[in-house]
Amino acid sequence: MLQLIRPLLLTLLALGFSACSLNIPVENELTDPNAITSVQTAYEALSSAYTSYPKEAYRLSLLSDDFVPTFTAGQDPSSPRLYSYTDAELRDLSESLWQGYYETIRDVNAVLVRLPSLRSTLSPQERRQLDYLEAEAKTLKALCYLELLQLFATPYSDTAHPAGIILKDRVEREELPRSTKAEVADRIETLLNEAITTFTTSGTPAYGSVPGFLGREAAKTILARLRIYQGNWSGVEEVTNGLIPEQITRALIPQQRSDWRSGDQRFALFASTVPSSYFSRIYLQESNKKGSLAYQLPQRLYLEEGDLRHHSYIVDSTLTVDATTTRALQLPGKYVHLILERSTPSLTYVVRRAEPIFLRAEALARQGKEDEARTLINAYLSACQSAPIAPSHTGAQLLEDILHEKQREFVGEALRFYDLKRLGLPIVHYSPNETRISLTIPADSYKRTLPIPLSERSNSRIGAQNPGWPDNLRQP
């Protein structure tokens, strides 16, 4: 029966499930704990949790400084409002993300609460398979907690506002207070360390190799994300040991446009299924032409023609400046090339194999190990056939270079949004085609932390709203 798990899970992920609200009892038969009676049904339930995981990298990238609008951006009314940081759009986003993450956590909990009694009925081989599943579930839960913390709590260094997010271990609805940021971080670390240990000892998953599922390397990379969020540089260096190949080659680089189609495991440590509508905001669905793309890249992120990433990361276009002048224009190409060719991607990358390189390089530089940091990042740039960071760049300039290269690599994948917040950097947005600065969001703006949504404010134990946001979010 186990040989049927892989195709079944892929089918379930492709179909997608309608996630329930935090306030609605579990009705999905796949996540009903009483329906989990075997390894196979446990994996079916876990697939529902994977599907519930929010897919908002594009909208978070709009809130960062990854994109600049084109003159067609206004044809999609919600994206320009989000790009302009309107309170209404931020409230809508907070509601979507809060419910999406906690639906995923609820689905994970439905699996975890059933495992102890199920384990006693299984053979030794099935127990190892169940152990692997448990590690996946804990990793997914930790990822949700980390992203909730980054979105709904002030920066980790802000000791004046210690409130984090709600930690939930039960399936049933319950009113709980927000734990502190430190308590949440400790829980995330515990979940990931337990998962990493189990991944190491339990062998391979029962369903074989599937790109939409988590494993040991993904768990370690998420742990590195947690530690860089906390400013634990030595911890980042420690956990990224073994995640980076001794020889960094072009094999890490999605060079072909088709490499963005289905979460290729050569590049993905974790990829998430997406609905076909996911990409509709970045282009105008009715035309499927380059001219219909709503957002372009800022010029500082342009890739050189000889860079191996150019072919798949970039859509080349031309901007008419005036009657006699044009200039090259680079539009985001990840996934978009496929859409322009009328081919819809089925998964998006959430954790990529290249990410530990940039996490480790930053951590090394911050510990004064600048030569090691520069050598590491330049090895990746060399594989990309991109210009290296100069030996003369040290100190703050070296850190700026590393973060700049990280943004060029992961543009549109939401990582920049989290980096700008933890680094305390302002967000600068532009009018179409970078003609002028349209908006600057300083590091201390209340808009940098999403509000606890209205749906959760009925929780009598939730405590104060996030700084700067009205307690009644219906206010204009």
What is each of the regions a protein language model found here?
Residues 20-64, 240, 303, 388-389, ...:
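Membrane-proximal, proline-rich intrinsically disordered regions
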Residues 105-108, 185, 192, 240-241, ...:
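Inward-facing hydrophobic residues that define packing positions of alpha-helical scaffold repeats
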Residues 121, 125-130, 151-187:
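Short coil/linker segments at helix-helix boundaries
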Residues 213, 230-353, 398-432, 449:
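Extended ligand-binding clefts on enzyme/binding-domain cores
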Residues 33, 60-74, 154-163, 201-283, ...:
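Short, surface-exposed recognition loops and adjoining beta-strand edges that mediate ligand/DNA contacts
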Residues 79-152, 179, 197-200, 344-348, ...:
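Conserved, well-structured interaction surfaces
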